[in-house]
From Swiss-Prot:
This is Tryptophan 2-monooxygenase. GO terms for molecular function: L-amino-acid oxidase activity; tryptophan 2-monooxygenase activity. Binds 1 FMN per subunit. It holds the Pfam family RolB_RolC. Gene3D superfamilies: 1.10.405.40, 3.90.660.10, FAD/NAD(P)-binding domain.
Amino acid sequence: MANFFYSRITNRSYSTKNLLNIEDKGRLKDELEKTRQTNICEICLHPRGHRASVCRQILMGFAYTSKTVLEGLLSTMPHDDAPLGKIFVTDLPPYDEQVPQVLLMQAAALVTSYEYSFEDLAYFLVLPLQMALMQKSPSLGKDFPVISGYSITKDSVHSPVAFGRNLMPRGVSCEFPQIDVLYDYRGFLEGGAFSEGVTSFPKETKKPKVAVIGAGISGLVSATLLLRNGIDDVTIFEAKNVVGGRAHTHFFKGEPSVCAELGAMRFPRSQACLFYLLEYLGINAMTKFPNPGTVDTGLYYRGRSYNWKAHSLPPAIFNRVHKGWRTFLHAGFVDGVAAFASPFTLTECLRLRNYEFASSLWQKWLDAFSSETFSSGIERIFRGAHPPGGEKWTRDVDMELFKELGVGSGGFGPVFGCGFIEILRLIVNGYEDNVMLLLDGIEEIPRRLSQQKVGSYSIRDRIIHKEVKEIIRTESGISLAIGEGMHATFDRVIVTSGFTNIQLRHLLTNDDSFFSYDVNQAIENSHMTGSSKLFVLTQNKFWKAEELPSCILTTGVAKAVYCLDYEPDKPSGKGLVLLSYTWEDDSHKLLTFDKGERFQILKRDLAKSYPRFADLLEPADGDYDNNIIQHDWILDPYAGGAFKLNRRCEDVYSKRLFFQPLRLNGEPDGRVCLAGCSCSFSGGWVEGAIQTACNAAMATIRDAGGLISGDNPLTNEFVNYHY
C-alpha cells in the first residue's frame, strides 16, 4: 500500500511508512524512532495549517483507530472528505510493554466521552502534534502513566508519516484469577494436584485420619485432593441422602433431558477452576444462559410493557441508565481529580496477569467505597458531579429503572443494601458476562466426582449419610457426634457446612479453641441471602412459537422469568420456565405459600405485563404435583441461605474465612479447616468452593507433616488488601 502526501509547509511530497507487518515491539520502536528523526521537523503542521514556530513544541503523536477507519483515512487524506470515526490521539507509543491497551481505552473514553473497544484502537497512525493541544486524562494513581490526548476533528487532521498495528499488551484468555485472590488455582490443579498428586510424606510421618463434613462440590474436591495426594483414610459425612449441596439439580419424572437448577445456575466462562473440573470430568454440553438483553427480553415498568430485542439497545426509557452504566464499565469514575479504574480495565489486568496494576487499582476502590452500600455507591457515582455518561440519574425514576435493569443478569433491587464492593467484585471477575447453562445439570459434577475411584474404593464408598452434630476437641483428636450417641474420632477435619450449622450444630464458635475470635465473628455475622425459585415444566416451548420474550424482568412479584431450552435440537420437546427467581424481601414474602398457591400468584402477576405468556403457561400434562418445583434456600436446614453476600464494611470477613486454613493471619492450628463458597470471596459461585477446597486440603496435608512440591496456595504471596 503506497500513500503519498503533500506538505503545504515544505512544498514537497512524502510517503508514509507502512509498518503493518511489524509484530515485534522492539523493531517497531526502532522504526518509529527513525521516522521521527527523518520527518518530524519537515512535516510538522499546526492544526490550522501554520508553520510551528518552535519545533520542540511538536511531538510525534499516535492516532489510534480501527482498521476500517485507518483504511478510509489512508485512501482519502489529506483531502477534506477524509472519513473520521472514533480516533484517539495521544503521546503513548504502540510498543509500550508496560501499558496495557485497556489503559489507553479508559483514557480515550475519559478524554473523548466515547465508548471504545479493542477493535477501535487496534491500529495507529503517526501524526505531528502540538503539545499545547493535548488534554491529560485523570490520573489512576502515582504508579500509572498519565495519558494525554484529544479527539481528532476535521480541522485537526494531519498527514500521517507512518501507520501500523497497536502492539500494547492485550489479554486473550476468557479465564483468569479473581481480583481478591490473584492466584492461578487452575494452574495448581492442572499441575498434577488433582490427578497424580504433588505431595509426599516422610517415612517417619504418620498420615492423618481425616473427616470431610459435607459432600457438596467443595467437600468432594477436598476429599479428591486429599486422596490423590497421599492421605489414605478419608471419610465424608453428608446429612442429606444425595451429594451436591447447593449444586442441586432437579430432574422431572419421565424427562431425563430437562432439569431445574434449584441452586447454582449460571456459570461464567471466567471461572477457571470450574471449567477445569468440567473438562477433567468430560462435561461439555452447555449453552448460553438467557440473560437479559442476550435474548429477546420483556421489561415491565409502571404498568407498561417494553420489548428489548436481543443484542440491541434497551427501550428508550432506559437510555440514560444504560448509557451511564456502559460508560462506567469502560471509563470508570472520576471523583474530582481522582480517577477510578473501570471494571473493564480491572478485568483486562486480570487477563494479562498484571497483578501489580490490578491490586493497586482494586485497593483504590476498596479505600474509597468499602463503606458504601450498593445503593449509596451507585448514587455517589451517578448522582455526583461527574456522572459517567454525562447525565445525572434521577432518584425517583432512573434509580428505579436501574434496579430493574441490573448489571447484566437482571435486577439487583433486592440487594441494594449489600456492599458496593461485593457487586463490583462480581463485575470485575467477569461473573456477569459470557454466562453458560449446563445441559446435564450442575449436579453432574458432584455425581462424577463421587464416582472417582482412588485406590480400592470410589469416593462415594467413603460417604456416610449422617448428620454431624457437635464437633469436640479431645485428647485423642477431634470427635464428631454423628447422632444416636455415636462418635467418631479424627486427626483432622475439613468443614464445608453452612454458617448456621457451624455455629449452632457443630458449636465450633463457642470458644477460641478451633478458630480465632475474628474468624468466629466472621462465621456468626456473615450475611446469607434468602432466595427462592419456582420452575414449571411445560408441554412445549410455547414462547418460541408465539414469539414471546425468553426473559422477562418485572417490578411485580415474579421479578425475573427465564425460558430455558435444554433440548435445542428438539423443537417439539418439553420447555422449562423459571417463573420466579427472587432474593431477600422478594423471596421472603413468598415463603408462606405452597407451590400451587405460589404458581397461581405468580401467573396472575405475570398476566399484567404479558397476558399471552400467562395464558399459555401451564405445567405439562396438567400435572401440578410433578411438573412444578420450588425451593426456598433460607428454609433449607443445612444451607441457611442461598449464598453469602457481604454488607458494607464486611469484606474483611471473606478475607478471614478464605485464609483461615493457610493461617496467614496468625490463626491457631485448631486441626479444623474451613472450606466452601461461603468462605471465599465469591459466595454462591462454584469457583469459590473449589478454591477453598484447595486451601483446606493442602493445609491439612502440610500441618500433618506432608511435603508439597512446586507452586501451591500455601507458598503463594497473596496480596494483603486492606478492606
